[in-house]
């Protein structure tokens, strides 16, 4: 197994992974044009020619035969060019002594608290390879 930086040459393999992942993995779109643009950004990021706001690092996992079987990525600083939304888990309390009511309700709050933080993205391992702890390499 080998983890390495993704390149434009990995486009066909990443497109196949994106198709396998389906629409739920929004950071790995099943669009050849979008993936190619992203891979160009990835190459520029590893070359050190982009600012933190634009840097996007994508890795691929190869098996012993050289086949790309998984991917993971890191955005250097999420949300510096477009909004980066996340959820914060909080608590909503409803109380009334007169009605003898006290209730705590776990609540998700939409925030931008992680703006500027690094973010893991595009984490996917092809179904036939989800064994032997290969996912830990990603």
Residue ranges of each PLM-predicted region?
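Residue-level detector of conserved, well-ordered beta-strand and adjacent loop positions
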Residues: 4-7, 62, 75, 121
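Conserved acyl-donor/pantetheine-binding loop and adjacent beta-alpha core of acyl/acetyltransferases
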Residues: 76-122
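Active-site rim helix/loop that mediates acceptor-substrate recognition in acyltransferases
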Residues: 18, 22-69, 73-81
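Conserved glycine-rich acetyl-CoA-binding loop
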Residues: 113, 126-137
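A short beta-loop-alpha structural element at the N-terminal edge
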Residues: 2-14, 27
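A short, internal acetyl-CoA/4′-phosphopantetheine-binding micro-motif in the GNAT/acyltransferase core
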Residues: 62, 120-131
